[in-house]
């Protein structure tokens, strides 16, 4: 069962499937993040109940760039590396290393797009995974905050910043004043350069990529929002 303790943190006990204390380390890491404090205990209970356990070998490709999204993953044992193939680097540009308690696979599920990177196990290990529909119901909806343009502008006036997650070529064609450009596939690599005290409003053309970016930031404890309708839906573009 998952409950709140007196300090405002989650306590975990008697999760279906059991396991050793060491085996639950990944669960503890997840529940200690600020983002998971926004998720109702009932959602978390259902989330852990519906997750499937998967064993992996070193060198195994869990997610391949260009494939359709089907699952959200959390590492429960071992480590993985995130790479992205580019025209200039066919072997893959290293974007991040992931360890126990860290997750991946969110972007394609939220944006309904293709996988934008490849995830390969660096060691033997284990994962838990959650199907797309369960992910959207239990995790995506509680963590994703949409804002209309008037509200977004109010937040900007109070110190929030636009985070444009389109490609640099799109950004150069047109962008909002003072917007910061961090393409979606670079979010994991660049997240440490962002100010954790600054609210960010993610934007893209339609809202698909920016919703994935806002979710990733929320997972990491940022105060993140996504512009409803994207730039196109709000007629924000070159004159």
Q: Where are the language model's segments positioned?
A:
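Cytosolic regulatory regions built on CNB/CRP/Popeye-like sensor folds
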Residues: 1-173, 187-188, 209-232, 239
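Helix-loop module immediately N-terminal to the HCX5R catalytic loop
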Residues: 178-201
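Short secondary-structure transition/capping segments
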Residues: 194, 237-239
């Amino acid at each position: 069962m998952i409950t709140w303790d007196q300090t405002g943190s989650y306590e975990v006990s008697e999760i279906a499937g059991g396991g050793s204390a060491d085996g639950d380390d990944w669960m503890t890491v997840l529940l200690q993040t600020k983002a998971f404090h926004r998720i109702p205990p009932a959602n978390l209970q259902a989330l852990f109940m519906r997750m499937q356990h998967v064993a992996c070998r070193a060198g195994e490709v869990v997610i391949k760039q260009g494939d359709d999204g089907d699952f959200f993953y959390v590492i429960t044992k071992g480590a993985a590396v995130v790479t992205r193939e580019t025209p200039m680097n066919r072997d893959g540009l290293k974007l991040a290393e992931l360890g126990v308690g860290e997750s991946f696979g969110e972007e394609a599920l939220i944006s309904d797009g293709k996988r934008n990177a490849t995830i390969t196990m660096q060691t033997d290990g284990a994962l838990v995974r959650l199907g797309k529909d369960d992910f959207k119901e239990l995790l995506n909806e509680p963590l994703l905050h949409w804002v209309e343009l008037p509200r977004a502008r109010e937040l900007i006036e109070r110190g929030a910043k636009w985070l444009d997650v389109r490609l640099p070529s799109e950004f150069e064609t047109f962008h909002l004043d003072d917007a910061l450009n961090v393409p979606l596939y670079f979010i994991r690599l660049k997240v440490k350069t962002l100010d954790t005290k600054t609210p960010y409003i993610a934007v893209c053309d339609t809202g698909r990529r920016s919703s994935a970016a806002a979710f990733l930031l929320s997972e990491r404890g940022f105060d993140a929002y996504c512009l409803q309708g994207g730039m196109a839906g709000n007629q924000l573009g070159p004159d």
